[in-house]
Amino acid sequence: HALYDSIENLGKRNIKMVFLLLVGYPTETLEDYEQTLQLIKWSHNYKNLIEIRINPAMILPNTPLEKYHWYDSIEHWKYKNEDGELDFAERYRRWDEANNLSLSLGYNIFPKHKEQKRLLDEKLKKYYETSKL
């Protein structure tokens, strides 16, 4: 696999890397997500050279993605893919799991992770308060 070969080649040469990972994107299947977790696990031998930044998919106004979602409350959106509906709670769960895995393996994570988590925790709380789950 070319990605794994590239990581190994960079790691052997002590070249720093940044992983910019997006979870919960519209076409992401459970298998895709599990491959992301496998990448994090596999790459841990080079964890001192890797900074990981993981973000949940979010809708930006006036983008093509905005056309392919619907709101289940004022602030929250979801969409369907082959695995079913992917709502904010599931995107958050994937984001949190991937970040916790990265932390448990000793990776350098995005410096503002704690602030990002606080903001997403607030959004998740509001999601549960306003959604019909």
Residues of each region from the PLM?
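A structural motif corresponding to the C-terminal lobe/cap of the Radical SAM core domain
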Residues: 1-133
